[in-house]
Amino acid sequence: ELPASAPIIDVDPDAAGPSSQVTSPTDLKLFTAANPWTKNVKALTKSSSSDSIINWLSSAGGWGGGTMKIDFGIHVLNADASTPKKSFTPTSEFYTPDCDNVPFPVPSGGAVEGESGYQCTMDGDCHLIVVNKGENKLYEMWRANISGSTFKGGCAVVWDLAKQYPANLRGEGCTSADAGGFPIAAML
């Protein structure tokens, strides 16, 4: 479970972040139902093409900043019933009807991906990811930007953590905050 004393779970614990309290991403324990991203894969046989894919990615510069890594300074925030929710103005990256326009929990002291706060200053993905275990929901938004009292955001998705999603996840044609149809936090 998410520790009540740690409002921020930092997937990049080496980066300067908004909180000194860091919890491992393995402590998230998202999605109670049997979904693909909750399956323990340690005992599975490695794909015969795995090494060649990793070698190709490494020789091509890896992901992002030229390094093979799974973290990019993504903060997974913890919300509870007292966390205020804010409505946002959709940007041109909000795709109706595939995205959810619902108020988002905005925990105090949090940050969007790649930033030390809620303002998206670097023109990056600026994902806002919030887990509310009391609601059993995962909120994810792409290109979130809160500047003063103005909150704008691209595609936003709310995942039901207790739901057993079908093979097409949120449904044919639906997207997600990562544009691939998958929950970001569950795959960190």
Show which residues each predicted segment covers.
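N-terminal low-complexity segments that are often proline-rich with Ser/Thr-Pro
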Residues: 4-7
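Short, surface-exposed polybasic-aromatic patches that bind anionic ligands, especially phosphate groups
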Residues: 9, 17-188
